[in-house]
């Protein structure tokens, strides 16, 4: 009998007999680790699954760590044939558990459902319907909502599951979209955000996936949390259209909503909550719009709602987030008077992604300015600068003292962010053409080896752990 088999049997027996001791958590932690690193199960685990089910439905103990139990369950259902799982957790059992209102039991059920194989095995059952009922119930606690969202995010990658949600539950979706309850409406937004990553053009229903501008305007004026949720949803739609092949059609549906967000920004002083809580989301949304191939969208928004002129207080905020190629094409003149300082490093990092913008700004990126900067801001700028060949040429040919400071600054690395930034600068440089590095190649390689081998400028494992905590 292997150690894993023995641990499975011991855990199953303890759960079945309800004999829970403090040592059970150590047993579950060990078993979860061993199962996670394994490719197969050495024994039939229906006995363990039955014990988990029996324990969760009939008992509870403050000594038992339910998160560890879920880790064990997740590892088990990921390794055993799903038909074995269904022999223990039938569809009726899963539905009953969802209706129970019990947090631990519901999270367990979500783990089982998420492991469904084939993915659409539950599409012809009421299981997804019950999940949606529980999800949209205002009294459902956040932990269960999170578990449901995670599980639905896995299930909706399958077409039959999406059909069950979008067709069989269409009346439910329309009802919650029109409801007056902010909590329920925000959950609806989160659900369609999850769905939007997988839906096809044929499945994308405007009456479900697009929020009426009147609703957005009302939330902008009266409920800032819902308005932020709407912003996040449209940011996700724009991200999908920008990053996923074949999803460009999303733009035709979202572009009629662009103006309402421009109006929100223009009214930020009038609407206190928008100016103080939603502005960063609006800037992110405008950033996404600026990266669309058709630059007329951002150009029209700018002209109407946030014209970019030197005297505008918000100018630097937009120069920090907008596509620098758009800035280069339309507003290169705005960069003439921009001086590099620690407070606007992020703006420079964004702008120098475009070579025309870089040419306009490169005189500001000099040895004196960089060497006078705080270390982290200096490394942030260098991280951006070393991502382009023209930036590397400027650095290696025109700023020898900065190059020396990169190589010799190991002792200035005092916390993890400094370490990570410096490491990225080295990696960016060493990925460049060796001829561009010239005399700097060997010193860079030598110091990079020192970093990797822990001889200089590197933390002990304890220091790194402390920083993460």
UniProtKB/Swiss-Prot annotation:
Cell compartments where the protein resides: Cytoplasm
Function: Involved in DNA mismatch repair in slow-growing cells. Acts as a chaperone during the assembly of the 26S proteasome, specifically of the base subcomplex of the 19S regulatory complex (RC).
Alphabetically ordered keywords of this record: Chaperone, Cytoplasm, DNA damage, DNA repair
Domain of life, per lineage: Eukaryota
Classification via InterPro entries: HSM3_C, HSM3_N
One example of a Gene Ontology biological process annotation: DNA repair
Gene: HSM3
Chief place of localization: cytoplasm
Protein name (Swiss-Prot/TrEMBL): DNA mismatch repair protein HSM3
Pfam family, one: HSM3_N
GO CC annotations, alphabetized: cytoplasm
Gene3D superfamilies: 1.25.10.50, 1.25.40.580
Assigned protein family: Belongs to the proteasome subunit S5B/HSM3 family.
């Amino acid at each position: 009998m292997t150690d894993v088999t023995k641990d499975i049997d011991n855990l199953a027996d303890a759960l079945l007999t309800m004999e829970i001791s403090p040592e059970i958590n150590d047993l579950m932690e060990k078993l979860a680790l061993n199962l996670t690193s394994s490719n197969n199960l050495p024994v039939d685990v229906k006995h363990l699954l039955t014990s988990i089910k029996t324990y969760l439905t009939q008992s509870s103990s403050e000594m038992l760590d339910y998160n560890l139990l879920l880790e064990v369950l997740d590892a088990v259902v990921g390794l055993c044939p799903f038909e074995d799982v269904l022999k223990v957790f039938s569809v009726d059992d899963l539905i009953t558990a969802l209706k129970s209102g019990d947090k631990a039991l519901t999270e367990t059920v979500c783990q089982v459902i998420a492991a469904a194989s084939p993915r659409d095995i539950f599409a012809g059952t009421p299981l997804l319907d019950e999940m949606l009922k529980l999800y949209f119930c205002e009294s459902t606690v956040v932990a269960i909502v999170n578990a449901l969202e995670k599980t639905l995010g896995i299930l909706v990658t399958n077409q039959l599951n999406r059909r069950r949600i979008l067709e069989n539950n269409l009346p439910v979706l329309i009802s919650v979209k029109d409801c007056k309850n902010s909590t329920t409406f925000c959950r609806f937004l989160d659900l369609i955000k999850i769905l939007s990553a997988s839906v096809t053009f044929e499945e994308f229903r405007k009456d479900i996936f697009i929020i009426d501008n009147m609703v957005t305007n009302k939330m902008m004026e009266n409920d800032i949390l819902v308005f932020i949720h709407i912003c996040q949803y449209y940011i996700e739609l724009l991200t999908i259209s920008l990053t996923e092949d074949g999803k460009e059609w999303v733009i035709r549906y979202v572009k009629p909503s662009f103006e309402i967000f421009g109006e929100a920004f223009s009214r930020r002083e009038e609407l206190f909550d928008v100016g103080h809580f939603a502005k960063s989301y609006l800037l992110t949304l405008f950033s996404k719009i600026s990266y669309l191939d058709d630059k007329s969208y951002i150009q029209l928004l700018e002209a109407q709602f946030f014209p970019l002129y030197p005297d505008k207080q918000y100018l630097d905020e937009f120069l920090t987030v907008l596509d620098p190629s758009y800035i280069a094409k339309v507003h290169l003149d705005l960069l003439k008077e921009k001086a590099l300082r620690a407070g606007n490093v992020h703006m420079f990092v964004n702008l120098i992604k475009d070579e025309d913008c870089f040419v306009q700004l490169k005189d500001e990126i000099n040895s004196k300015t960089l060497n006078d900067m705080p270390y982290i801001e200096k490394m942030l700028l260098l991280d951006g600068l070393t991502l382009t060949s023209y930036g590397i040429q400027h650095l290696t040919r025109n700023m020898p003292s900065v190059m020396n400071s990169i190589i010799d600054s190991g002792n200035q690395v005092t916390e993890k962010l400094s370490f990570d930034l410096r490491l990225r600068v080295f990696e960016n440089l060493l990925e460049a053409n060796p001829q561009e590095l010239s005399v700097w190649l060997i010193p860079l390689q030598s110091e990079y080896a020192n970093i990797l081998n822990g001889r200089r400028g590197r933390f002990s494992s304890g220091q790194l752990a402390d920083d993460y905590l």
